[in-house]
Amino acid sequence: MLEKFIKLTEEVKRQKKEFEQIKNEVVLLDNERLKKVVEIAKEAIIFEKIFKEKIKYNNSREWHSDEVKYFYDENGKALKGILVGEINLSYHRGNTGGERVDKELFLMEDGSWKVFIYEARWTYYADCSNEYKRTIAENQDISMFDIDEIIKNIIEEVQNSLKYIVDEKNKQLERLEKLKSLKIS
């Protein structure tokens, strides 16, 4: 019986070692794939300024620039990126409002990654207010985010960028045709 037990534990150790080797190879290949996707996509994506804080009152659908604060680098340039990963940390909804906290992963304009903590608070009263805040996370480890989800989101952003550019180009073409058709005397 002891001999069977020893063989069993040896087999477990052997399988664990093989599993770790396979897992390490998967991580390496996933990281190479992600790096290649970022390298290709970063030239096609339209990156947006990342807000630090914004407040919305009375359920208005419009944001006013004085109600939004953005992140800036040490040179005063706005940080730009796209949200490519999200992990919900907490969520609470009650009779008067609610709040949620997420960990977010952004692909930055320079191809680097930045992890943020996102907090949203809202109320349901007649004078509704929604408050959204982001802070740069202390832990910048991106391994907790799903690589397949990140790649899917990057591809969607490239598609969104294409749609936006085509729409804007078509608007400009219309404007150009209109201007050309006007007679200037």
Language-model segments: residues:
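Serine/threonine-rich low-complexity intrinsically disordered regions
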Residues: M1, T9, L29-N31, H64-S65, ...
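Leu/Val/Ala/Ile-rich N-terminal alpha-helices, chiefly Sec-type signal peptides and the beginnings
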Residues: M1-N58, E62, S181-S185
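Arginine residue identity/basic-tract feature
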Residues: K4, R14, R33, R61, ...
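Generic low-complexity, intrinsically disordered sequence content enriched
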Residues: I6, V12, V38, L83, ...
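Detector for Asparagine
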Residues: N24, N31, N58-N59, N75, ...
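Amphipathic, interaction-prone secondary-structure segments
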Residues: K42-D127
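Mid-to-C-terminal oligomerization/interaction "stalk" domains of large proteins
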Residues: A120-I184
